């Protein structure tokens, strides 16, 4: 796609908005570099992936992503046998941790409700190297600090350092707080040359033994290491040297492990960037209230209620724009300032967005083709250096278009043939259009030449269009009318403004008969189009109501059928139980009868009784194996001590208390929750042990209902605190490590309550305000244990 079209249609403004919605630096950069593709399969794949993230954003909320530094420079250094520093290893840990968080976030997504197959290739790269992750997690933190747990030797050294440092402090306190403090410039302990010293007044130098390490600028203060702490300071320096060596050994070991996983690390970083980039696309779609465009193979364009994305949403006027099908060329005629140019730009910009894998601000069902090139000549782009006139610049642009145009090209020309003698300009415009049409291009042009009004009537596959003008308000409505050419409405406007009638009539008489007839025809077409549009809107509204009513009736019927079936199933279950009991009792009776044949009971009576019982058995056979009944029975017969599955959490637990007729208390791990009997299912004892979850390898995975964020805005304080408590329980059960609490700014009461709760919770590892682009002081990021 040529760069000029991106500039003309302001595509860069779209990529800037997209970049701001990304979280990570690599994704922000990718957003700014986004360009339209002319490959059909690639565009289709991009749109499918954007749809997957849009659905995920709608159902589960935002991915648990935070910004991270690009790790590719670090993996390159690993590739040349270099060892990484602690900060670089901390960055690797963050990348692997984010991959783990996303895997957990997606674990319980129901594939029947959310199809993520389009991003399987991205998710499959999030396979975290277990050994490397464990070693990094115990050795460094995200800030690049080496932890005591990195090795036993380091833990021992740091313990000795802290103990020795305490001894030094105690000795120094004797100087700063005891009788010797009067000899000091300040009662403090400071450090010079990595050794603990005290500031001694110069005249009392002899009161202290030891070593002078420094003096003040005036020379009045000497920084002395007292003799009493010399050995302790020496020991501290020795421990520090040992610590540094041990840290070097640890970093070397971790670098060696990371070197074996270079490909995995790069793949994970690339996938995180890709997911962030796709999520930014989904956020932009939500922000613009955009929808997924459907791709067509015939290079047609059908935009329903299309809106220009750079115009204020409160002011923009949506329009239907169609090109292809019955016509390939559209001429938008009429006066200036009516919205012709904006309509042209809307069509072009939405086309570029779609071919970039972005959703477009138009109604669902909108269709676009995939063009090899989009060319435009819009506005005054005359070159000062070449001293070209507006007309010359205009013609130069069109010449360049004519050299490259073909059937896979969309051409947008504003005011074709303008800037010269109207008669010659109109003739040239007609000739240019004829040439472009022969190349089978899709063409949209605007013009104010009246000579072109008949073009749409005497050329095949060509249609006129115009921008609607309200004669009552004497202002444009900015609505595109397809099928009729526009006109100036000069006489009507003059009358409305109070022009003398005789002057207006004289002007009308001065017009050529042909022009007068054309204007009358246009006026008639305008009236007919308005009537047809009103009728169509009325029919569409009626059809929409009918479809919604049909849907509601179908839902009601389905609900009724389900209720009836449940009642029948329950009745059959009870009947099955009765038959089973009777059969067992009858078998005992028959056994007794057979023993008593010699008492006078006839054998044919026994056979007859067996036949009747077997008939009952056959009738009950299906009931005994009815899976629905078995499931219902499990669900409705539970008691304290039973192991159950809590359906809303997807977790197993034990019933600890019956709270009411239909409500139980269930303990899941360390958490107790209140649940309805409709939300639990009893688990048979031999199935009580849950199967170990498998790490995600394909899209066929189950995922929880827990979201990674909670929005408390607009809630009362008590309500917000209750919802927060429940949400933290849900997040812990779902295995989430990082969640976002959105409390807003307002008076600060909710935020204070949230922070007070988090400080008191034993399940919270840490928390802080969200980054500026994720809510700032209006949201809190929480790390769970």
UniProtKB/Swiss-Prot annotation:
Kinase in keyword set: no
InterPro entries reported in the protein's UniProt record: DNA_mismatch_repair_MutS_C, DNA_mismatch_repair_MutS_core, DNA_mismatch_repair_MutS_sf, MSSS, MutS, MutS2, P-loop_NTPase, Smr_dom
A Pfam family reported for this protein in Swiss-Prot or TrEMBL: MutS_V
Keyword Kinase found: no
Enzyme Commission number: 3.1.-.-, 3.6.4.-
Binding site for ATP: 334-341
Annotated ranges, domain Smr: 710-785
Gene Ontology biological-process annotations: mismatch repair; negative regulation of DNA recombination; rescue of stalled ribosome
Keywords: ATP-binding, DNA-binding, Endonuclease, Hydrolase, Nuclease, Nucleotide-binding, RNA-binding, rRNA-binding
Role of this protein: Endonuclease that is involved in the suppression of homologous recombination and thus may have a key role in the control of bacterial genetic diversity.
Assembly description: Homodimer. Binds to stalled ribosomes, contacting rRNA.
Family statement: Belongs to the DNA mismatch repair MutS family. MutS2 subfamily.
Protein name: Endonuclease MutS2
Source species of the chain: Lactobacillus helveticus (strain DPC 4571)
Upper taxonomic lineage: Bacteria, Bacillati, Bacillota, Bacilli, Lactobacillales
